[in-house]
Swiss-Prot record:
Alphabetic keyword roster: Cell cycle, Cell division, Centromere, Chromosome, Cytoplasm, Cytoskeleton, Kinetochore, Microtubule, Mitosis
GO biological process terms held by the UniProt record: attachment of mitotic spindle microtubules to kinetochore; cell division; establishment of meiotic spindle orientation; mitotic metaphase chromosome alignment; mitotic sister chromatid segregation; regulation of microtubule polymerization or depolymerization; spindle assembly involved in female meiosis
UniProt entry tagged with the keyword Cytoplasm: yes
Family of the protein in this entry: Belongs to the SKA2 family.
Assembly information from the UniProt record: Component of the SKA complex, composed of SKA1, SKA2 and SKA3. The SKA complex is a homodimer organized around a central W-shaped coiled-coil structure, formed by the interacting domains of SKA1, SKA2, and SKA3, each end of the 'W' is extended further by the C-terminal microtubule-binding domains of SKA1 and SKA3; the complex forms extended structures on microtubules. May interact with NR3C1; the relevance of such interaction remains unclear in vivo. Interacts with the MIS12 complex subunit DSN1.
GO molecular function: microtubule binding
Signal peptide: none
Subcellular location: Cytoplasm, Cytoskeleton, Spindle; Chromosome, Centromere, Kinetochore; Cytoplasm, Cytoskeleton, Microtubule organizing center, Centrosome
Protein name from the UniProt record: SKA complex subunit 2
Origin species: Mus musculus
Matches recorded under InterPro entries: Ska2, Ska2_N
Function: Component of the SKA complex, a microtubule plus end-binding complex of the outer kinetochore that stabilizes spindle microtubule-kinetochore attachments, promotes alignment of chromosomes at the mitotic spindle equator (chromosome congression) and assists suppression of the spindle assembly checkpoint. Kinetochores, consisting of a centromere-associated inner segment and a microtubule-contacting outer segment, play a crucial role in chromosome segregation by mediating the physical connection between centromeric DNA and spindle microtubules.
Amino acid sequence: MEAEVDKLELMFQKADSDLDYLQYRLEYEVKTNHPHSAGEKNAVTVLKELSAIKSRYQALCARFKAVSVEQKETKSCICATLNKTMTMIQELQKQTNLELTLLTEEEKAATEPLKSHMPD
């Protein structure tokens, strides 16, 4: 999941860079090719709209980062709770002299993905 988040963040950074480049190219084209043309007003409007889009994009990136941080915190909390629960179960089994049963293949398969998210 973290790899996907990192990939999305890189995509957002590239899109931001692309928007900067497009704005620069548009400004350059307007200045060099149409310094006093009647269409200049429309080009300026386009540049203003591009700036507004960039601002909205940056706000979206900020919200995305906040969601990403919250998602990581939630995942850590869930993993910690699961670890604590598993430890408590093992302690209860020892205290009550219950036989510790080995996990079935299905249970082992279910715990493998969880292990990758749990701290050592």
